[in-house]
Amino acid sequence: MRGIFSTGVLDAFYDHQYRPFDFCLGVSAGSTNLAAWLAHQRGRNYKVITDYSCRPQFISFKRFMLGRHWLDLDWLWEITIREVRLDLERFADQPIPLFVVTTKVADGQAAYIRATAQNLEHLLKASCSVPIVYRDFTVIDGEQMTDGGVADSIPVIKAYEMGARDITVILSRPDGYRKKRPRSPWLLRRILSKTPRLAEAMITRDMRYNRSIDFIENPPEGCRIRVIAPSNGFAVGRMTTDAAKLKAGYEMGLQAARSLF
């Protein structure tokens, strides 16, 4: 649900016709927001987050305790494709490449896959598939994939390696946030005993996240990084369904982006 902030940022970009980018890298909810923005669908993801994602058919701890999904992405993808589908034709017709970050279940490494009209919806589902709370893995090109945020939450170093020297980063945490190591790594290893490399990637996620923050705070010579992040008053967490908090998070994103103009 923290993706509501970048929803606001990108809707503001849309309002100002701000599209100066050579390419985009998206992770988890951020990838879905970028896809809607590139497809010129202002407001689409605001509805997805504040309506569909808040319904008990999608988010249910009781269902999780019964051995099923806490976050049912199968239901969410099916209903949003039916009722508020991304405009795949318009996405394909625009010139800015989108690379979606996923995590390979077999080895816990990041994959950066270029989105097309043919693979977009499947890629986005893979990148949003948070391990444990969504009990399945999405298969891309014969390989099981999961949440891109596990392997590379902030792909700023990858953007630099791809040649970017003027980089805009949209964060879902306040500026200065540092990720901490999980308190119970043994529990993750136990829950994910069938996928040990993925378990280790989740346990060491803080190292990669904080390395990206270090890169942002101390970019190489000749590299400019602009950060758009929520303020410390951002009250939206992964499971937030409170309408007022979600609306405030969206407005915060709108305002943060508008300050650029």
Could you tell me what each predicted segment is?
Residues 1-27, 35-261:
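Patatin-like phospholipase
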